[in-house]
Amino acid sequence: MFGSEIKSFVEHPHFKRELNERALEGYLSFQYSPGYETFFKNVYKLPPAHYFFYKDGKMDMQRYWIPEFNAEEDKPLEYWVDEIEKTFDDSVNAHKIADVEVGSFLSSGVDSSYVACSADVDKTFTVGFDNGEKYNEISYAKELSELIPVKNYSKTITPEEFWGNFGKIQYHMDEPLADPSAVALYFVCNTCLLYTSPSPRD
């Protein structure tokens, strides 16, 4: 059997829901399941940069790409600054190809702020938690959005919404993930749906 989600296996009559204790060890160390094993025994992830053929009961897995790192220590710092900026801009532009408005997620962090500024987006989307300023970045996101300037859409997640949707979020993730940003990502995606086109093409 193969699928894009583990949950696609669970209804199969021959599938056994058995805990993979080795994945549990990795989870307790890294807060997620690293590597190619999963929390389910005998269920594996397809490794990055791999594909497989399945024929006559046999699976043949092949690697199609290996990253190469060639050190060029003789280049000055200014060269690498320009290279990083060019690579970043190329990536942003590749993700902006659309015939509709483009938006981006925005927190108070440097990475999402840089993307929002460089991509010349039309909208930004932010969520925060309803427990004071410590875990709520909405005010900073709105401030940056005004400077760009673009319209910022935001949502404050209440404790009731957090715990009320936690089971659903875990269901979609297939495996335990001890990173609360998964909850924020779920809600910011739902916030996007309220202010963007429902068309599958968009």
Q: What name fits each language-model region?
A:
Residues M1-D174, L185, C189:
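Cysteine-centered catalytic environments shared across enzyme families
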Residues D179:
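Substrate-binding/specificity loop regions of serine endopeptidase catalytic domains
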Residues C192:
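Hydrophobic pocket-lining residues that define ligand/cofactor binding sites across diverse proteins
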Residues Y195-D202:
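Conserved small/polar residues in nucleotide/adenosyl-binding loops
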